[in-house]
């Protein structure tokens, strides 16, 4: 409804509930600014929350139904007004609202006031009072002959108990009952009225306690029936039914500010000294665990106690309160002995609470886990003794019952005793205490009911007392109100369900009152407006599927739990019942009650619903010597009582409907079911030995209902056993539902009257009205539901005059004419409503669609009704009426304002018009002139600017055109210049090549001619001195070990021998076929050898021949190769000269490879040999001449010569190996002569056979079979395996040893039968080469003069035949790529690189699969990490695996051994758009490794799983972090592989463009990754360095190196952080690698771990002593390492600590290569000098 500015409205307020406010203004979004009148402050609030304020309603209403605009705000305001004037009672219809004043109000309950409410006709004239409610109930019973009920509800402390007592006093006074009944044979001179009053102190003492909210809080529900004789309506009897006694208050109170039941404090602090001594009690409550509380609270309780009522302000002590209870018990015909037994039971409960338990220990002080009675306190033993004494059984038996539990065995009658734990014993103790009190309370209630029967009833045929069936009753229900605590359990669920049932009944009652009002006014009434909470109630009590039924079912399950119960609730009612709410919190559910939404915690529901005590404890109590205790737990008497009550119930059910269900059948005691808040036990037998009368329970098999779980029949022991089990299955919820249904059934059969008690404040202060607290209670008790019911109908009801006076302002807008002489308010009101209603419907028709129109016209109720005296208006029409009124008032105000504004403006206009007319004329003329001039100037400026812009545009276009022409001209010039230069370069290159070719041919022809001439001369000399040569050869074969440096004659002999052996070469012989069979010397050869002599002419010939050999060796060293023509001429020449043939012993492992051109630059040395300890690197170039350059310190295995087995490039691209014949020189410091020692470790030489010199040339006779033509040569660096190059006269020594031996082999020209050697061996392919020269050997001889290395001593082993050497050299020879062209060589390399790339991709896919299958999927399935951490740790690893799998399939698609059809470039180009994933993966890598380290520290399951994976053979011992970094490492390797593929791919190959494009893309990605970029650059430098060493390209050990690499198993890799500055060392085991740091526990732990696995620690190599091997990073365990085999066949990997160490190593590599190049250059110069000297000689 629209409100005007300045209107007074009701505004919601958090503290005051509602406040009056004045509207100041409207804001955007329906926000209203209101000034609160009481608080003088401004707030902004939504317009929808404002409630209408009617000044006529702002006054004191005794009946709030009279309020016209009934709302929450006006109800709250009216109650506050009346409370301030001490008017605590207010009507709202037939509901009485009572507010607790917390003070005495004078004469409010005096006899005079009571007498005013004796006449029913004076009720409306008298103010509201609780007497009026009692009077209305009494008169209704009298006049209608119908039972009545008065329901009193409200929260604790609102005055419910006092209200019930007030009603009881009124009814007793009104009935004028006689003091006794003459028909009662047991006339005790006590009237029923007195009995009813005397029962109140007993019930309050045993059922009330002090809480923080109420000093006399009833902890149970009570329904008191006061019966009246139908003849004279005098009180004739009474009965009490109790509900939900709070038994948990016995053992567990919320805090020290809450006390236990009053009776305990009366007994402790009010009993006499003799009584305390007899009961063993002390007068201090703090000495009892069940009573201990705050001292201030106990003192306050003593002051406020008044005769047990607890409600007064007297100063009576507790002895008087205890005495009042005793007197009340005696008045209930309870004998003194029975009273003593009651107090004895109470004392036993207190002593029982002081029994403490502790864990029992065995003799050796070990904990057994079972409980025992605490022996540390003497008070515990005293309490145990007192409990046994008071309850009437032996102490030891009771003790065993608390400590042990009996279990039935599988056999017949077998029972086992099982000790209990401490908590179980404590639970048994507390359960026993609660059971004793609850059953004692029920027994007292039963005795009170029996007393009521004795005073009013008569004996039946069986001698018992029965009530008359035709009596009427008035029931007073004192029930707990709605509860919504911070923690709500099963107790609150049952309480709120009770209030739901009562609210349903209340709604029905209000509905009937509304119907009555409508019928009086003649208004049609529809039941569709009824507010019903039936669905909410069915949610609780629906059979089989209700909340309580499901709870009972779950309690019967063997493994039932609250979790499964909640799952059943959610499955059954989630999204199917609007009142059930599924909550997010664990173990909770929500219910939408009429008073608000409540969240319940399900913890402990099953135990509370069962609420049992051990059977042995109950059996022990039933056998007590105490009569009271025995009667409380005697099953036979209980069953008898059940049978009697069942018979009474059956007879009562046959009575008429008006009185049968509420007459004397209900006077038997009705005990309450237990609960933890208001609780008493069910199946445990913890309640009164009584039955509830009435209809049979749906949970019980008989017509009666046993509260304690007793038997319906006790005819036999078997029946007792079976029935006991059956009754024990009845739960607390089942008892509660049955009792509640009976109560509601009883109430529904009566006329109900309501009293809603309100607590004005929380602090229980007088004259303090807390609006917000009162408002919440009004909602909880259902008062505001009355407002809702009215608003569902016609909430606005006014008489005709009031309506006309308010809405007569809209008559003009409605065009309604009024007859002022005769005004008919009824007709005018009707005419106004009809016109407004018509407009309202028209507006709805314009706004709504056709469906909504049909709904309005057919389904909606009439918007107004006109009664006899009132007008009933709906909310919608009322809002529209108020809007029309507002619009009418606004329209009137606007018209008035417009009229006065018009007059004012008109007068002002006339005054200003004449004075301004002249001035306006002048000003306008001057302004027009200036405007014209300004327009002319602006127009000129505009034209000038346009002209300039046009000229500027033309100029720029011309400049652009000229620039374009100039650019085209320059491009043409550059293109022409480029073509010209290319043509010139091409011509110049061709010219130079032709000149070089001509010069080379010329020189070769000259040399060939000169060589032929010399050979012709030598042939002549050979013929003359042949006999002399033979004799000298025989002498040389018998020589011992010679020293070439000390015997000049040896040189002469060598020269002669060399000259002689050159005459038997046969170049046309077939290739040498392994093995070479040695031939025996013929007799002719022996005689020839013996006839040879030494003469000056012979020496001259030998010198000439030696110079020829030196020239050949020099040509080979400097790359001089013969052309095809010269080769043919040489062959022809050799054929003419008896077919000379040469055998070359080479160190090339790749023999058979085509011989590349030799360059003038000497090749650097290869890395040191394999099969040895690492050789240290020289620190700089300064130590190049050091004799210990290649020395190895601390080599325990061997000294001297070592060889190189393999050498690796980065990755697997160019892993090479050297020849097994390579020799290394090393001075032996152990020998005094300082002579170097030579050793070979590749061939199987014996110590007696001298080593074979690398690249030596021997001539062989043509008579050797299998040698037909020369084997192609391999150019050998002068420094390769280079100790020979540094030795003086080493070549001469070699020739000395080899020439005679081989010469002797060639003396015979006729084939003969071969002789089998004693120790045959084969000649390795790596020891024989096909074409060579003696230049390298000659250079070694020449360089001896400038070398500082001592001359080596070569020892010769004596040999008597030529077979020894041949036997030693007989090794297999493999065929090589003879005459291979460059294209074929490139093709071969391309195949190897592509195969390497496929293997690399295969390894990569395998590693990615390991990450996904071994790590990612199990971690995700086992939920070892969160989803976020898994995404951060593994990033795009699954996508990368899929992509690379597709790449591998594409590469392996064509099984082409030549790799011609494999499109490497196109394959990688197809996946290039995924390359950016590597950038993302790399940027996330640091965070991933950080998460990995953190989770390994704090996440034990994750850490254990990683350790488990380390032991998995699939992972090869690599940790997870090594696999995580593999994608970035792999993308860094691709550029090298792609570049190598491009290098050996022809330009016309179809895959070449794709390769170049993908190379650019991958390189760009790699460059963007900082770490990968650094690694790639470092790899490239190493590749460039190794490319500078000659001979590496011809080595083919790539597959062998890969095999070695993959065989190495990495067990564990420990990575150090960047902050660690400790030096790193690599510890090696059997193929197990561990990277650690010094000074940490990781090292010792790892070593101990390997020792326990019986793994031997083999080596420890610091960086300073490492081999020449390289690892770019400690993480690159697979991609940048070289595996070196030592004697123990372990794997060495070098890991650098930092970039400085790596840079130092890199410099050492450079220095070594430069040193080797310089050494080669010096040796080449020495060879030239040697040749010059020989020629001169």
From Swiss-Prot:
Coiled coil regions in record: 926-1039
InterPro entries, per database record: DBL_dom_sf, DH_dom, Kinesin_motor_dom_sf, Myosin_head_motor_dom-like, Myosin_N, P-loop_NTPase, PH-like_dom_sf, PH_domain
UniProt feature, compositional bias: Basic and acidic residues: 947-1028, 1121-1131
Domain called IQ: residue spans: 889-918, 912-941
Biased composition (Low complexity): 641-663, 679-724, 1044-1070, 1082-1098, 1132-1141, 1304-1359
SUPFAM superfamilies in alphabetical order: DBL homology domain (DH-domain) (SSF48065), P-loop containing nucleoside triphosphate hydrolases (SSF52540), PH domain-like (SSF50729)
Actin-binding: region residues: 754-761
UniProt GO molecular function: actin filament binding; ATP binding; guanyl-nucleotide exchange factor activity; microfilament motor activity
Residues annotated for ATP binding in this entry: 154-161
Record field: compositional bias (Pro residues): 1071-1081, 1162-1171
Residue ranges constituting the DH domain according to the UniProt record: 1389-1572
Stored CDD domains: MYSc_Myo45, RhoGEF
Biased composition (Polar residues): 1143-1153, 1180-1198, 1274-1288
Record's keyword terms, sorted: Actin-binding, ATP-binding, Coiled coil, Cytoplasm, Motor protein, Myosin, Nucleotide-binding, Repeat, SH3 domain
Domain named Myosin motor: residues: 59-886
Role: Myosins are actin-based motor molecules with ATPase activity. Involved in macropinocytosis and remodeling of actin cytoskeleton.
Family: Belongs to the TRAFAC class myosin-kinesin ATPase superfamily. Myosin family.
Subunit structure: Monomer.
Descriptive protein name: Myosin-M heavy chain
Gene giving rise to this polypeptide: myoM
């Amino acid at each position: 409804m629209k409100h005007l500015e300045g209107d007074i409205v009701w505004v919601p307020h958090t503290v005051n509930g509602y406040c009056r406010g004045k509207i100041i203004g409207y804001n955007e979004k329906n926000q209203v600014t209101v000034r609160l009148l009481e608080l003088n402050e401004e707030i902004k609030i939504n317009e929808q929350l404002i409630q209408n304020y009617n000044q006529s309603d702002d006054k004191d209403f005794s009946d709030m139904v009279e309020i016209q605009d009934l709302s929450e705000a006006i109800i709250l305001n009216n109650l506050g007004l009346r409370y301030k004037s001490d008017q605590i009672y207010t009507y709202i219809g037939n509901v009485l609202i009572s507010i607790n004043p917390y003070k005495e109000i004078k004469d409010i309950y005096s006899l005079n006031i009571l007498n005013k409410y004796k006449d029913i006709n004076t009720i409306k004239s008298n103010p509201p009072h609780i007497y009026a409610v009692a009077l209305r109930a009494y008169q209704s019973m009298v006049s209608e002959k119908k039972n009545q009920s008065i329901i009193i509800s409200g929260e604790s402390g609102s005055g419910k108990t006092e209200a019930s007592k007030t009603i009881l006093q009124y009814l007793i006074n009104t009935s004028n009952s006689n003091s006794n009944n003459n028909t009662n044979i047991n006339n005790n001179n006590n009237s029923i009225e007195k009995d009813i009053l005397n029962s109140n102190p007993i019930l309050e003492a045993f059922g009330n306690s002090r809480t923080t909210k109420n000093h006399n809080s009833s902890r149970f529900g009570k329904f008191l029936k006061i019966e009246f004789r139908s003849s004279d309506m005098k009180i004739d009897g009474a009965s009490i039914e109790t509900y939900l006694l709070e038994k948990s208050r016995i053992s567990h109170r919320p805090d020290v500010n809450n006390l236990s039941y009053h009776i305990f404090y009366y007994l402790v602090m009010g009993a006499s000294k003799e009584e305390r001594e007899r009961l063993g009690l002390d007068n201090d409550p703090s000495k009892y665990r069940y009573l201990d509380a705050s001292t201030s609270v106990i003192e306050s309780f003593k002051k406020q106690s008044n005769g047990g009522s607890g409600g007064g302000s007297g100063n009576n002590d507790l002895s008087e309160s205890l005495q009042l209870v005793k007197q009340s018990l005696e008045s209930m015909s309870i004998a003194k002995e029975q009273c003593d037994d009651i107090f004895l039971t109470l004392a036993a409960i207190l002593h029982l609470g002081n029994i403490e338990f502790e864990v029992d220990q065995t003799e050796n002080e070990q904990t057994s886990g079972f409980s025992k009675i605490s022996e540390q306190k003497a008070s515990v033993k005293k309490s145990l003794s007192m409990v046994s004494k008071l309850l009437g059984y032996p102490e030891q038996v009771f003790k065993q019952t608390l400590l042990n539990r009996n279990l039935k065995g599988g056999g017949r009658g077998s029972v086992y005793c099982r000790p209990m734990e401490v908590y179980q014993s404590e639970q048994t103790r507390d359960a026993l205490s609660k059971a004793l009190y609850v059953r004692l309370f029920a027994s007292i209630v039963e005795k009170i009911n029996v007393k009521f029967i004795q005073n009013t009833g008569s004996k039946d045929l069986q001698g018992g007392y029965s009530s008359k069936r035709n009596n009427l009753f008035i029931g007073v229900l004192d029930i707990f109100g709605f509860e919504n605590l911070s923690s709500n359990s099963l107790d609150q669920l049952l309480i709120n369900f009770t209030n739901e049932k009562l609210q349903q009944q209340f709604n029905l009652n209000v509905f009937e009152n509304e119907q009555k009002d409508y019928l009086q006014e003649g208004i049609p009434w529809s039941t569709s407006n009824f507010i019903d909470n039936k669905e909410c109630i069915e949610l609780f009590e629906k059979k089989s599927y209700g909340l309580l039924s499901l709870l009972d079912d779950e309690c019967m399950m063997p493994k039932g739990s609250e979790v499964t119960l909640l799952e059943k609730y959610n499955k059954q009612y989630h999204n199917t019942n609007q009142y059930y709410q599924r909550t997010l919190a664990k173990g909770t559910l929500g219910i939408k009650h009429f008073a608000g939404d409540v969240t319940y915690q399900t913890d402990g529901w099953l135990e509370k619903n069962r609420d049992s005590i051990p059977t042995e404890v109950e059996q022990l109590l039933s056998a007590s010597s105490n009569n009271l205790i025995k009667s409380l737990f005697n099953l036979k008497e209980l069953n008898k009582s059940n049978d009697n009550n069942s018979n009474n119930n059956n007879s009562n059910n046959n009575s008429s409907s008006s009185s049968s269900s509420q007459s004397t059948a209900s006077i038997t005691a009705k005990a309450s079911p237990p609960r933890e808040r208001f609780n008493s036990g069910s199946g445990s037998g913890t309640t009164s030995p009584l039955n509830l009368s009435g209809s049979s329970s749906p949970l019980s098999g008989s017509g009666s209902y046993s509260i304690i779980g007793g038997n319906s029949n006790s005819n036999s022991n078997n029946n007792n056993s079976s029935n006991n089990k059956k009754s024990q299955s009845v739960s607390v919820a089942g008892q509660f539902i049955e009792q509640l249904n009976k109560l509601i059934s009883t109430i529904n059969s009566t006329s109900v009257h309501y009293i809603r008690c309100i607590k004005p404040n929380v602090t229980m202060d007088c004259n303090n009205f807390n609006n917000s607290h009162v408002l919440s209670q009004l909602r909880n008790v259902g008062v505001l539901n009355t407002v809702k019911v009215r608003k569902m109908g016609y909430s606005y009801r006014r008489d005709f005059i009031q309506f006309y006076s308010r809405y007569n302002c809209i008559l003009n807008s409605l065009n309604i004419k009024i007859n002022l002489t005769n005004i008919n308010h009824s007709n005018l009101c009707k005419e106004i409503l009809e016109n407004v209603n018509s407009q309202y419907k028209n507006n709805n028709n314009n706004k709504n669609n056709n469906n909504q129109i049909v709904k309005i016209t057919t389904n909606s109720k009439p918007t107004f009704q006109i009664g006899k005296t009132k007008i009933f208006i709906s909310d919608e029409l009322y809002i529209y009426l108020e809007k029309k009124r507002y619009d009418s008032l606004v329209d009137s105000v606007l018209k008035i304002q417009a009229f006065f504004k018009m007059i004012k403006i008109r007068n002002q206009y006339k005054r200003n018009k004449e004075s301004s007319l002249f001035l306006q004329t002048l000003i306008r003329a001057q302004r027009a002139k200036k405007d014209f001039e300004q327009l002319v100037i602006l127009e000129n400026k505009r034209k000038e600017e346009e002209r300039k812009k046009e000229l500027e545009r033309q100029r720029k276009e011309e400049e652009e055109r000229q620039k374009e022409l100039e650019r085209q001209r320059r491009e043409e010039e550059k293109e022409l210049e480029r073509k010209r230069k290319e043509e010139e370069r091409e011509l110049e290159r061709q010219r130079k090549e032709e000149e070089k070719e001509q010069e080379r041919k010329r020189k070769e022809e000259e040399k060939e001619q000169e060589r032929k001439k010399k050979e012709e001369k030598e042939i002549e000399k050979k013929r003359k001195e042949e006999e002399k040569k033979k004799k000298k050869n025989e002498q040389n074969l018998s020589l011992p070990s010679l020293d070439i440096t000390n015997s000049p004659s040896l040189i002469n002999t060598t020269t002669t021998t060399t000259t002689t052996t050159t005459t038997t070469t046969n170049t046309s012989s077939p290739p040498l076929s392994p093995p070479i069979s040695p031939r025996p010397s013929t007799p002719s050869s022996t005689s020839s050898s013996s006839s040879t002599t030494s003469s000056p002419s012979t020496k001259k010939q030998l010198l000439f021949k030696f110079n020829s050999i030196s020239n050949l060796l020099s040509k080979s060293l400097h790359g001089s190769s013969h052309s095809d023509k010269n080769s043919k001429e040489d062959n022809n020449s050799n054929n003419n000269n008896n077919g000379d043939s040469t055998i070359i012993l080479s160190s090339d492992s790749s023999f058979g490879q085509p011989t590349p051109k030799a360059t003038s630059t000497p090749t650097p040395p290869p890395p040191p040999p394999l099969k040895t300890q690492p050789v240290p690197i020289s620190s700089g170039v300064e130590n190049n001449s050091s004799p210990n350059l290649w020395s190895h310190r601390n080599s325990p295995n061997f000294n001297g010569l070592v060889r190189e087995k393999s050498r690796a490039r980065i990755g697997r691209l160019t892993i090479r190996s050297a020849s097994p014949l390579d020799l290394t020189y090393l001075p032996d410091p152990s020998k005094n002569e300082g002579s170097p020692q030579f050793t070979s470790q590749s061939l199987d030489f014996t110590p007696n056979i001298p080593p074979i010199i690398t690249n030596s040339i021997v001539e062989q006779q043509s008579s050797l079979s299998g040698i037909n033509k020369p084997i192609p040569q391999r150019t050998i660096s002068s420094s390769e395996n280079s100790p020979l190059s540094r030795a003086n006269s080493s070549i001469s020594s070699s020739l000395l040893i080899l020439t005679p031996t081989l010469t002797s082999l060639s003396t015979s020209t006729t084939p003969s039968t071969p002789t089998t050697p004693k120790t045959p061996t084969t000649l390795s392919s790596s020891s024989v080469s096909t074409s060579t020269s003696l230049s390298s050997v000659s250079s070694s001889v020449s360089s001896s003069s400038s070398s500082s290395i001592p001359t080596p001593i070569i020892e010769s082993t004596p040999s008597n035949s030529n077979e020894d050497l041949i036997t030693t050299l007989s090794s297999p020879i493999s065929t090589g790529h003879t005459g291979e062209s460059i294209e074929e060589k490139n093709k071969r390399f391309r195949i190897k690189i592509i195969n390497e790339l496929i293997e690399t991709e295969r390894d990569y896919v395998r590693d990615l699969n390991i990450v996904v299958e071994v790590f990612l999927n199990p971690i995700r399935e086992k939920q070892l990490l969160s989803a976020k951490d898994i995404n951060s740790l593994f990033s795009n690893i699954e996508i990368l695996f899929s992509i690379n799998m597709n790449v591998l399939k594409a590469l392996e698609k064509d099984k082409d051994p030549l790799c011609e059809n494999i499109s490497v470039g196109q394959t990688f180009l197809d996946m290039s758009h995924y390359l950016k994933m590597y950038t993302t993966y790399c940027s996330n890598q640091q965070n991933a490794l950080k998460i990995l380290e953190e989770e390994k520290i704090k996440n034990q399951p994750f850490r254990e799983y990683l350790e488990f994976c380390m032991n998995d053979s699939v992972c090869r011992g690599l940790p997870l972090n090594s696999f995580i970094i593999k994608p970035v490492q792999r993308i860094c390797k691709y550029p090298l592989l792609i570049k190598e593929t491009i290098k050996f791919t022809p330009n016309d190959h179809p895959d070449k463009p794709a390769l170049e494009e993908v190379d650019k893309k991958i390189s760009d990605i790699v460059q963007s990754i900082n770490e990968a970029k650094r690694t790639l650059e470092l790899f490239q430098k190493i590749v460039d360095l190794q490319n500078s060493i000659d001979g590496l390209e011809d080595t083919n050990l790539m597959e062998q190196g890969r095999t070695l690499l993959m065989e190495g198993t990495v067990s564990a890799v420990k990575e150090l952080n960047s902050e660690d500055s400790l030096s790193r060392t690599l510890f090696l085991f059997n193929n197990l690698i561990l990277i650690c740091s010094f000074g940490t526990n990781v090292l010792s732990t790892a070593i101990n771990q390997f020792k326990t696995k019986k793994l031997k620690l083999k080596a420890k190599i610091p960086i300073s002593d490492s081999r020449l091997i390289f690892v770019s990073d400690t993480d690159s365990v697979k991609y940048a390492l070289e595996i070196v085999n030592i004697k123990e066949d372990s794997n060495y990997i070098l890991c650098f600590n930092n970039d400085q160490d790596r840079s130092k190593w890199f410099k050492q590599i450079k220095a070594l290569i430069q040193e080797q190049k310089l050494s080669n250059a010096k040796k080449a110069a020495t060879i030239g000098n040697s040749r010059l000297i020989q020629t001169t000689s």
